[in-house]
């Protein structure tokens, strides 16, 4: 019998109204949502459900919102068998909660701080990210090396799927790549709506502050392996996982390698839990033979639970 990996999306999947269908409709989800609200110092649920103040897109708000939505969905599922977990960037924190490494409230506090540090690291306009479509990793890496100078850098940041590599770095170089992308061989280069050079070595400036912050929380060995973004293999040791979560700030997300590692362990069913189907699409591009289930709404939860009574 094949194995199951539960996967969690990262930033970019947020949308106004997220998790509002679960609230007061699904008891276990409602408990998670209320707990998150009690843990942070701003009106998280108002931001998720209506975004009246337009702040959902700010990374210090986006991160706790996405973590909360994924865990609210996860907690509502009956008889979910898990062999491995994996998350994309921020989604890795949902994996930590799912596998018992972090208490949910601690994870909420950590991703809130992670977002604040990321937002404070560089003024708006200094760094950015872009998705390069139609080139493989080696091609993108060569282009980045050519564009980078002693003063400014651009690096591969998310190795998402064959033909989709996200780069990160100084904004002028991102803009140059967007402008020259086609002549460099890319089908398209799309700037991403992010406020900083995430997953690039520029983010090392917050390494020490973040490491000190997460040390105050209890980290437990994982109940089942978490395939980590930085090394694309399953880890269960709490200290190793914690170290890798710091490295994750300034290291590329090895999503292709992580997915292939899981398939090599016998995983043939991926369950994406959280808003959107971004990871489902990437996994299909990596291997079209695996089964993929998406759980992103109350209806999805009801459908799953009706089939797993």
Question: What role is predicted for each listed range?
Answer:
Residues 231, 291-309:
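Short, flexible loop segments at boundaries between secondary-structure elements
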Residues 191-194, 263, 296:
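Short glycine-rich catalytic loops that host catalytic nucleophiles or stabilize transition states
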Residues 89, 218, 266:
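Conserved functional loop/turn residues at catalytic and ligand-binding sites
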Residues 2-139, 269-298:
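FabD-like malonyl-/acyl-CoA
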Residues 78, 182, 263-266:
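Non-catalytic positions within long, well-ordered alpha-helices that form the structural scaffold/packing
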């Amino acid at each position: 019998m094949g194995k199951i990996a539960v996967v969690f999306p990262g930033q970019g999947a947020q949308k106004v109204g997220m998790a509002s269908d679960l609230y007061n409709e699904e008891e276990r989800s409602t408990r998670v949502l209320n707990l998150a609200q009690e843990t942070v110092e701003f009106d998280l649920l108002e931001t998720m459900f209506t975004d009246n103040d337009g702040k959902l897109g700010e990374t210090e708000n986006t991160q706790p919102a996405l973590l909360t939505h994924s865990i609210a969905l996860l907690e509502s599922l009956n008889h979910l068998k898990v062999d491995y977990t994996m998350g994309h960037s921020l989604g890795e924190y949902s994996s930590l909660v799912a596998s018992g490494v972090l208490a949910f409230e601690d994870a909420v506090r950590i991703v809130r701080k992670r977002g604040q540090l990321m937002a404070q690291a560089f003024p708006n306009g200094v760094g950015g990210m872009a998705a390069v479509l139609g080139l493989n990793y080696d091609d993108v890496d060569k282009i980045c090396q050519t564009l980078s100078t002693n003063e400014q850098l651009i690096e591969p940041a998310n190795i998402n799927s064959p033909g989709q590599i996200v780069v990160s770095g100084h904004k002028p170089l991102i803009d140059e790549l967007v402008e020259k992308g086609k002549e460099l061989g890319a089908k398209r280069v799309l700037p991403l709506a992010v406020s900083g050079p995430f997953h690039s070595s520029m983010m090392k400036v917050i390494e020490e502050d973040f490491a000190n912050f997460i040390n105050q929380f209890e980290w437990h060995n994982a109940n089942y392996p978490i395939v980590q973004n930085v090394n694309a293999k399953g880890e269960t040791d709490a200290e190793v996982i914690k170290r890798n979560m710091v490295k994750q700030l300034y290291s590329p997300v090895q999503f292709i390698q992580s997915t292939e590692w899981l398939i090599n362990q016998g995983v043939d069913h991926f369950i994406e839990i959280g808003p959107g189907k971004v990871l489902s699409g990437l996994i299909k591009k990596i291997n079209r033979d695996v089964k993929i289930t998406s759980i992103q709404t109350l209806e999805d939860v009801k459908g799953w639970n009706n089939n797993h009574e």
